[in-house]
Amino acid sequence: MAGEKFQKKGKEKWKEKVWYTVEAPPYLGSKEVSVALGEDSNSMVNRVVEVPISELTGNFKKSNEKALFRITNCEGTKCKTIFIGHYIGDDYIRRLVRRRKERIDIIEDVKTSDNSIITVKIVVVTDGKVTNTKKFQIRKVLTDFILNKGLSLPYSEFVRYLIGDDIYNDMISATKDIYPLKKIEVRKSELVSLSGISEIHAGSQNSGEEPVVQN
């Protein structure tokens, strides 16, 4: 009897929930990226949604990359989001770094023209051993490049650039006089603050519901 009551109560609670659609922000096309069950709109706010970047850009070479969106508010059953970061799968990164290759990591807090701050993590893989001088030069050029690019764009445009196709060729071009790099990736980004809204942690979770909704 107790088991039957528990099952009945669970079914009734499930029936009380509503299906919500989750949209990418306008600067990424306002596409529907996921659907999720919630008790009400308040239960949806602050959930984090993970979406393949290939679905946003149409570039299926980016199938290893995931974008993260946080739900900020709901209008009816439509949930609005902001981009809070992205990442490339660890397995893909490990495949890049093989024997007789060197890895150079660059991590910078990038400030955009509208005073948002996003941490950008770049990984560079060389085809062979490089001198410490070359490593220093590569780090400096790419650091200057990404910081200056951030200052030239508002957050919305910088996000599109960050997950788009042009950034790879631009980084290759920026370093071509130092070393003929072939493998550079922005392996991860994390929003720190959005135009005055401080301390946005990509990993924080809404305690009342499932924290990550996967498409």
Swiss-Prot record:
Note the InterPro entries from the entry: Ribosomal_eS1 (IPR001593), Ribosomal_eS1_arc (IPR030838)
- Which UniProt keyword terms apply here? Ribonucleoprotein, Ribosomal protein
A biological process (GO) of this protein is: translation
Q: Which GO terms describe its cellular component?
A: ribonucleoprotein complex; ribosome
Q: What Pfam families does the database record attribute to this sequence?
A: Ribosomal_S3Ae
Give disulfide pairs as residue numbers. none
A GO molecular function term, named singly, is:
structural constituent of ribosome
Q: Which family does it belong to?
A: Belongs to the eukaryotic ribosomal protein eS1 family.
Give the protein's recorded name: Small ribosomal subunit protein eS1
| Higher taxonomy | Archaea, Methanobacteriati, Thermoplasmatota, Thermoplasmata, Thermoplasmatales
- Recorded name of the encoding gene: rps3ae
